[in-house]
Each structure stands twice: as structure tokens, then as C-alpha cells.
From Swiss-Prot:
Family matches, as InterPro entries: Ribosomal_bL27 (IPR001684), Ribosomal_bL27_CS (IPR018261)
GO molecular function, one term: structural constituent of ribosome
Family membership noted in the UniProt record: Belongs to the bacterial ribosomal protein bL27 family.
GO CC entries: cytosolic large ribosomal subunit
Protein's name in the database: Large ribosomal subunit protein bL27
Protein keywords: Ribonucleoprotein, Ribosomal protein
GO biological process: translation
Organism: Shewanella baltica (strain OS155 / ATCC BAA-1091)
Disordered: annotated span: 1-22
PANTHER family reported in the protein's UniProt record: LARGE RIBOSOMAL SUBUNIT PROTEIN BL27M (PTHR15893:SF0), RIBOSOMAL PROTEIN L27 (PTHR15893)
SUPFAM superfamilies, per database record: Ribosomal L27 protein-like
Taxonomic superkingdom: Bacteria
UniProt-listed Pfam families: Ribosomal_L27
Length: 84
């Protein structure tokens, strides 16, 4: 005979899988063409010289070189470029 009242069930216990966003190659690091520099949602960082942008706003290197972060424009936008 049970001496404990039955416990109810919970409706919690779920979470989405992390998307691993963020900067993958930092300023001054060497990259090869095709290397992913940043994975992001929206354009937190904008594509500069020798940097391409994927349809999910991923920034990637178009040429070999070094990563350079810079802030430009009236809106202080962050740009990422590749210096050959």
C-alpha cells in the first residue's frame, strides 16, 4: 500500500539547441578563403573588403589574409575586412 500521494507531472524540461553563434576568427588572425569569421543573426557586423555574406548573415573570407575589425560611418557600424 502506497504511503505517498502520487506526484503530478511537470510541463517543463525543454530547451532549444544552442546555435553556436559568435566570432570564430578574431582581429589579427590569419584566415584562408572560405573561412567563417562570424556567425550571427542579422548584421551585427557588416561585410567589408574581401568579406562575403551568406544568406544567414554569416561573414566569411573571400581571400587569404588577416582579419581586421573597424568601426565606420555616422552610425558606428562594425565592419570586418581581410587585409591581404
Amino acid at each position: 500500500m502506497a504511503h505517498k500521494k502520487a506526484g503530478g507531472s511537470t510541463r517543463n524540461g525543454r530547451d532549444s539547441e544552442s546555435k553556436r553563434l559568435g566570432v570564430k576568427r578574431f582581429g589579427g588572425e590569419s584566415v584562408l578563403a572560405g573561412n567563417i569569421i562570424v556567425r550571427q543573426r542579422g548584421t551585427k557586423f557588416h561585410a567589408g573588403v574581401n568579406v562575403g555574406i551568406g544568406r544567414d548573415h554569416t561573414l566569411f573570407a573571400l581571400t587569404d589574409g588577416k582579419v581586421k575589425f573597424e568601426v565606420k560611418g555616422a552610425n558606428n557600424r562594425k565592419f570586418i575586412s581581410i587585409e591581404a
